[in-house]
Amino acid sequence: MKKISQVLNWLSSLKIAILLLLVIAVSCAAGTLIPQQESNQFYYDNFNKNPFLGIINAKILLLFEFDHVYTSFWFLFLLIWLGLALSVCSFRRQLPILKSALNWIDYKSPSQIAKLSVAQTIVTNNCAKSLEKIKLNLKKQGWNVKETDGRIAARQGVIGRLGPILIHLGMILLMIGATYGSLNGKTIEKFLAPGRSIDLLNNNEEKGLTIELQKFQIERDPQGRAEQYKSIVNVIEPNGNNQSKEISVNYPLRYKGLTLYQADWSLAAITIKIDNSPKLQIPIKPISELGEQVWGTIIPTNKDGKNQILLTVDSELGPVNIYDNDGTLLTKLIINKEEKVKGALIKIINIIPSSGLLLKHDPGVPFVYLSFAIILIGGSLSIISTKKIWVLHENEKSMIYIGGLSNRNLSGLSKELPNLISFLET
């Protein structure tokens, strides 16, 4: 039993809780700085040449699961450990403190009053009348008063003792929600062109919601840089019910546990005509060798496929750069303009952008929201001072002894106590 008690004392230690919080905070920072859920090759390409913090290369990063910090075994272990420590602390420390605060303590001798943090002694002509005045004054100021055989005990702000327990409960609930969301949540990143859709599967691997992109718009500043991008999406249920809403950066769509974010933008295709051909919608892909946001494709200009040109574009507004096989820039075509290129008449009809959508289903979100509400309530209650006052009298000496203590703001109580005495003396 002694060893169990020692283990429980160690678990409920404030130092251990602070250390765990610090480690978890550092881990979260690492999870923010290191890209998550990428392929192994991504980490080898990016962290072997430039190790994280100068020492953590791809091998170490993958070994310790820094590629998925929030679902790694050690991070979940830290959350469970902290939750256990907070639970033990609540049961072994905070609940007894609350229970003690709820119990009435009966001080019977002036020497006990004298040992309190704040104490005063006054002389009165009528002890019984003075005690009655003090009792009525305390009740008037919102104190909970109990009188036993001419002795008065009063308390105020006991509810403040509930604050730390609620904070612990909220933090435990927060970790439960975070863990549950990490293990059962799903995240999908998808680029959709207008008119395209994505089908989502439910828990039974059956078709669930359908997300359809109706319209996508990129707002640019005078220099041509993307400032905001907006999508009009349609969420369609299997029964045919649907909801249409515009989303943009920082303004997501929330629908029955699913959150749909406007995360990015891209270019999907170029609609083009070559000589007398019908309109051709040609997919384009990012070309990182030419720049961070450059898309392009290679097309032939004649039927044998040998006379090829490279089309590149960096904006849905154009222009389209056309290069020869050797990399020579042949021309720049704006939308709806046609030009002869290597013997072929080429016309750009339009450039089709695509919306980068981030879909998140996190079943732990309700727990997280509830936990923050509980933590806020607990934090507000913790501000409340728990104060206690005792009043005794000695008829033989015509003396009244009054004293009190407070878990915080003792100076406030020391100022409040003389007010009770001055009220009595007047």
Swiss-Prot record:
Q: What's the short name of a Pfam family annotated to this entry?
A: ResB
UniProt-annotated location(s):
Cellular thylakoid membrane
Membrane topology according to the record: Multi-pass membrane protein
Top-rank taxon: Bacteria
Q: Enumerate the transmembrane spans.
A: 14-34, 72-92, 162-182
Q: Provide a GO biological process annotation.
A: cytochrome complex assembly
What InterPro entries does its record include?
Answer: Cyt_c_bgen_Ccs1/CcsB/ResB, ResB-like_domain
> One GO CC annotation, please?
plasma membrane-derived thylakoid membrane
Keyword Membrane attached: yes
Q: In which broad location class does this protein mainly occur, judging by the first location in its UniProt entry?
A: membrane
Q: Which UniProt keywords apply?
A: Cytochrome c-type biogenesis, Membrane, Thylakoid, Transmembrane, Transmembrane helix
Listed under subunit, the entry gives: May interact with CcsA.
Assigned protein family: Belongs to the Ccs1/CcsB family.
What job does this protein perform? Required during biogenesis of c-type cytochromes (cytochrome c6 and cytochrome f) at the step of heme attachment.
Q: What is this protein called?
A: Cytochrome c biogenesis protein CcsB
Organism, as annotated: Prochlorococcus marinus (strain NATL2A)
Q: Which gene encodes it?
A: ccsB
